């Protein structure tokens, strides 16, 4: 009796009028988390076996009076312009004696009207549609004397927008052959139950446990749930664990945001698929639900709101890379445009200015934004990690690179996602001053070259290979010059008549006296061999020297 009283109190608090009033009190729009936190205690009160039925009924109430709209990644429950008419209250949520009250024969056929003799089978009609073991609830309660009237099941067919069938059409549909009444394959436990048993097909109100076998035969009376409804049933255990079975710490703002959005997507099933940001949060579910897990800062979700006209015009004009009066006017009206990024490349307006080499655009952007109180990040990175200084060096705009470093204070040690600094994108013909300004480590210990390109610094500023080639070429030219002078001197000596004094001058050595050639004792001297007559056939070919006197 205590559980029944609690269920009745919960039913009185959870109604379509209560949901409608709650939305109207909050201006017609409320977060899903606030809506669930308001009605969750009432849904959890009472018999635990009827919790699923109360939750389904609550979702039907919300669908009747509101829709879901997603703003900036957060789903809001927004009041409908024309709410749907409420359905009659179920018998399990009312007093125990309400099941015995007669109802009109032409009333809407609902699984909770148990007045007619054929009403108890209708109460249990859509139960086989649910997957077995979905919520861990028994098919029929065994401890309540009310029988079918006290069963807390809620058919998912109630959520369909099809008009209800009259009692006459329902009676005709129950007499159709079983070819149209095949149960869905999602109920394997009921596949063996017979579909034709005339004696048990029409039990009275007192027969509470007789006709469980006739559930598949009654399925064609209701419309088959849509695929979205079946997906909702499959995903419902996750929401049940979050709401009731596994209490988790509710103090974390990140966890509250995740639970609120997942409850809207899984529990109510009122909106489309979740965003990529929410899928990333779902993959971290065990870490977020654990009270001992360390909270990680989440990346800001991408904006789902389309661009305003001024933002679109700003992105289009800044991509041209030229400073115009239109850009100046847009920046004066909205100072936040200076930090607006292109959604494809991640470029800001300063990136486009550096890429095109327009120093005036870069200066005006920074100065106007600073005067407006919104300083520009000179070292902002694009999606590839490029800063404006990287782009200026990559496209060979030396003036823009010097302006970014000297005037705007850009950092030269920032690396992109490839690990490269700005000097590594300089072209081969870049100046020495720019390389030194960007911190090229290959220029350490060198001096700046002269204005004419010569001097001692010109040799040191070159690469080692070029230095070696220069030294080799200069040495070779000097050696060839000395050799040429020597040859000219010999030609001059041959042209002159050799006098005794001049011969002595040429033969005399200024350094030291000439050493005599040592002659080995065992071998004859060359002079002796040359004086001997040549025997054989070579006697006429090799001349012999005249004998010395």
Swiss-Prot record:
The modification Phosphoserine is found at residue 260. Residues 82-219, 235-256, 513-549 are annotated as: Disordered. Gene3D superfamilies: Ankyrin repeat-containing domain. ANK repeats lie at residues 345-374, 384-414. Residues 1-17 form the signal peptide. The keyword Signal applies. Keywords: ANK repeat, Phosphoprotein, Repeat, Signal. Pfam families: Ank_2 (PF12796). Residues 203-216 have a biased composition (Low complexity). Residues 235-248 have a biased composition (Basic and acidic residues). SUPFAM superfamilies: Ankyrin repeat. PROSITE patterns: ANK_REP_REGION (PS50297), ANK_REPEAT (PS50088). Belongs to the SOWAH family. PANTHER family: ANKYRIN REPEAT DOMAIN-CONTAINING PROTEIN SOWAHA, SOSONDOWAH, ISOFORM G. This is Ankyrin repeat domain-containing protein SOWAHA. It comes from Homo sapiens. The lineage of its organism: Eukaryota, Metazoa, Chordata, Craniata, Vertebrata.
